[in-house]
Amino acid sequence: MVTEIKSLKQLGELFASNNKVIIDFWAEWCGPCKITGPEFAKAASEVSTVAFAKVNVDEQTDIAAAYKITSLPTIVLFEKGQEKHRAIGFMPKAKIVQLVSQ
Protein backbone atom coordinates (compact mmCIF):
# COMPACT_ATOMS: atom_id res chain seq x y z
CA MET A 1 0.00 0.00 0.00
CA VAL A 2 1.20 3.49 -0.85
CA THR A 3 0.02 6.36 1.36
CA GLU A 4 -0.59 9.76 -0.27
CA ILE A 5 0.91 12.37 2.06
CA LYS A 6 -1.20 15.53 2.33
CA SER A 7 0.53 17.44 5.15
CA LEU A 8 3.74 17.75 7.16
CA LYS A 9 1.75 16.57 10.20
CA GLN A 10 0.71 13.38 8.40
CA LEU A 11 4.31 12.82 7.31
CA GLY A 12 5.50 13.26 10.91
CA GLU A 13 2.96 10.68 12.07
CA LEU A 14 4.19 8.26 9.40
CA PHE A 15 7.79 8.69 10.59
CA ALA A 16 6.71 8.22 14.23
CA SER A 17 4.93 4.94 13.54
CA ASN A 18 7.43 3.35 11.10
CA ASN A 19 11.14 2.60 11.37
CA LYS A 20 11.67 2.78 7.58
CA VAL A 21 9.76 5.06 5.21
CA ILE A 22 10.36 5.46 1.48
CA ILE A 23 8.80 8.42 -0.32
CA ASP A 24 8.24 9.01 -4.03
CA PHE A 25 8.19 12.77 -4.70
CA TRP A 26 6.35 13.26 -8.00
CA ALA A 27 4.15 15.54 -10.13
CA GLU A 28 1.34 14.93 -12.65
CA TRP A 29 3.25 16.60 -15.51
CA CYS A 30 6.45 14.56 -14.95
CA GLY A 31 6.92 11.88 -17.63
CA PRO A 32 9.41 9.71 -15.70
CA CYS A 33 7.13 9.95 -12.64
CA LYS A 34 4.36 8.25 -14.64
CA ILE A 35 6.69 5.30 -15.24
CA THR A 36 8.13 5.21 -11.71
CA GLY A 37 4.74 5.36 -9.95
CA PRO A 38 3.57 1.86 -10.97
CA GLU A 39 7.01 0.40 -10.18
CA PHE A 40 6.87 2.03 -6.73
CA ALA A 41 3.39 0.56 -6.14
CA LYS A 42 4.58 -2.94 -7.17
CA ALA A 43 7.50 -2.68 -4.73
CA ALA A 44 5.08 -1.60 -1.98
CA SER A 45 2.97 -4.71 -2.57
CA GLU A 46 6.06 -6.91 -2.12
CA VAL A 47 7.63 -5.28 0.96
CA SER A 48 5.51 -5.06 4.10
CA THR A 49 8.27 -3.99 6.51
CA VAL A 50 8.63 -0.50 5.04
CA ALA A 51 6.03 2.29 4.79
CA PHE A 52 5.66 3.50 1.19
CA ALA A 53 4.37 7.03 0.58
CA LYS A 54 3.95 9.52 -2.26
CA VAL A 55 4.10 13.30 -2.19
CA ASN A 56 2.70 15.35 -5.08
CA VAL A 57 5.14 18.28 -5.06
CA ASP A 58 2.70 20.61 -6.83
CA GLU A 59 0.08 20.11 -4.11
CA GLN A 60 2.45 19.84 -1.13
CA THR A 61 4.95 22.61 -1.84
CA ASP A 62 5.84 22.94 1.85
CA ILE A 63 6.95 19.31 2.03
CA ALA A 64 8.89 19.58 -1.24
CA ALA A 65 10.66 22.68 0.07
CA ALA A 66 11.39 21.11 3.47
CA TYR A 67 13.17 18.19 1.78
CA LYS A 68 14.79 20.32 -0.95
CA ILE A 69 13.19 18.44 -3.85
CA THR A 70 14.46 20.04 -7.07
CA SER A 71 14.24 17.16 -9.57
CA LEU A 72 11.55 14.58 -10.29
CA PRO A 73 10.97 11.86 -9.58
CA THR A 74 12.99 11.81 -6.36
CA ILE A 75 12.81 8.75 -4.14
CA VAL A 76 14.04 9.17 -0.58
CA LEU A 77 14.53 6.43 2.01
CA PHE A 78 14.27 7.43 5.67
CA GLU A 79 15.24 5.42 8.75
CA LYS A 80 13.90 6.67 12.08
CA GLY A 81 12.96 9.94 10.38
CA GLN A 82 16.47 10.59 9.03
CA GLU A 83 17.31 10.58 5.33
CA LYS A 84 19.49 7.58 4.44
CA HIS A 85 19.38 7.50 0.63
CA ARG A 86 18.18 9.73 -2.20
CA ALA A 87 17.75 8.74 -5.86
CA ILE A 88 16.69 11.00 -8.72
CA GLY A 89 15.07 9.74 -11.91
CA PHE A 90 13.33 6.55 -12.92
CA MET A 91 13.81 3.60 -10.58
CA PRO A 92 12.51 0.11 -11.45
CA LYS A 93 10.77 -2.09 -8.90
CA ALA A 94 13.80 -4.36 -8.41
CA LYS A 95 16.00 -1.38 -7.45
CA ILE A 96 13.38 -0.03 -5.04
CA VAL A 97 13.05 -3.44 -3.36
CA GLN A 98 16.85 -3.73 -3.17
CA LEU A 99 17.12 -0.25 -1.64
CA VAL A 100 14.58 -0.85 1.13
CA SER A 101 16.00 -4.30 1.89
CA GLN A 102 19.43 -2.95 2.88
Curated annotation (Swiss-Prot):
Residues 2-102 form the Thioredoxin domain. InterPro entries: Thioredoxin, Thioredoxin-like_sf, Thioredoxin_CS, Thioredoxin_domain. Belongs to the thioredoxin family. It comes from Mycoplasma pneumoniae (strain ATCC 29342 / M129 / Subtype 1) (Mycoplasmoides pneumoniae). Gene3D superfamilies: Glutaredoxin. One of its GO terms (cellular component) is cytoplasm. Participates in various redox reactions through the reversible oxidation of its active center dithiol to a disulfide and catalyzes dithiol-disulfide exchange reactions. Disulfide bonds join 30-33. Pfam families: Thioredoxin (PF00085). One of its GO terms (molecular function) is protein-disulfide reductase activity. This is Thioredoxin. Keywords: Disulfide bond, Electron transport, Redox-active center, Transport. Transmembrane segments: none annotated. The keyword Zinc-finger does not apply.
